[in-house]
Amino acid sequence: MGLELYLDLLSQPCRSIYIFARTNNIPFEFKHVELFKDSVLGKKPAAASGAERPRTGPSNSEGDGKISLLKKVPVLKDGDFTLAECTAILLYLSRKYNTPDHWYPSDIKKRAQVDEYLSWHHANIRANAPKTMWIKVLIPLFTGQPQPSEKLQEVMEGLSTSLKQFEERFLQDKAFIIGSEISLADLVAIVELMQPVGVGCDIFEDRPRLMEWRRRVEEAVGKELFFQAHEMILNIKELSNIQIDPQLKEHLAPVLMKMLK
């Protein structure tokens, strides 16, 4: 049995793993796990012009809970070995498939810089960027109530602070976070920052240094692959017209509200 990756490309960590594996020509079977089942999402958005929809294995809406004891994605299954958590999966793939050194450098100082960003990321960029989608799409979808503009403003202020720190502390005047080549740090950062873009919060506008960094990341992984991986998130607003099963709505509404706090 070969490598299997259980992913939903609505998820930022899943997108980073998908892009990393494809960019490095790692052979794997894409097991599409739908965090919001087909009955919720309805028909998925058509592929963007020039982008081929990712090839997937059978939908795993029934069995995904059996794959990971944590019952969440992403999950890697390599024979009888199962691994969860984005960073752990990225590092496993980089080591097993001996990917180019720039992704996770052998140089101890450069590797430490990647580790530093990955540690900082969770309490800063990841703590703010996803909330834009919860406020603008998911909470209204599951509660039937739009969130007050003050909520979004509060989140955007927190995100702006994180972006300022990102530019000044990590990006500085470099092409990428650790220097002249892309690393896992850049990949983990960019997929997170595309989340607000998908709901109409263009955080790259009026930030030329950040915009240029994004352009370089897109070119490093390939623009076609980049937009293929982000197709679903860039069409996330289409969810607003979906009819939600009342039981699912009752279950998820308080969960989302709790995550926003």
Curated annotation (Swiss-Prot):
Binding site for glutathione: 72-73, 85-86
Coiled coil regions, renumbered to chain: none
Domain GST N-terminal: 2-101
Domain of life: Eukaryota
Primary localization class, coarse: cytoplasm
EC number: 2.5.1.18
Catalytic activity entry: RX + glutathione = an S-substituted glutathione + a halide anion + H(+)
Keywords recorded for this protein, A-Z: Cytoplasm, Transferase
GO cellular component, one term: cytoplasm
Cytoplasm in keyword set: yes
Localization (cell): Cytoplasm
UniProt-recorded Gene Ontology molecular function terms: glutathione transferase activity
Enzyme class, first EC level, given as a word: transferase
Domain named GST C-terminal: residues: 107-248
One Gene Ontology term from the biological process aspect of the record: glutathione metabolic process
Family, as annotated: Belongs to the GST superfamily. Theta family.
Entry function: Conjugation of reduced glutathione to a wide number of exogenous and endogenous hydrophobic electrophiles.
Subunit-level organization: Homodimer.
Protein name: Glutathione S-transferase theta-1
Biological source species: Gallus gallus (Chicken)
Gene (UniProt): GSTT1
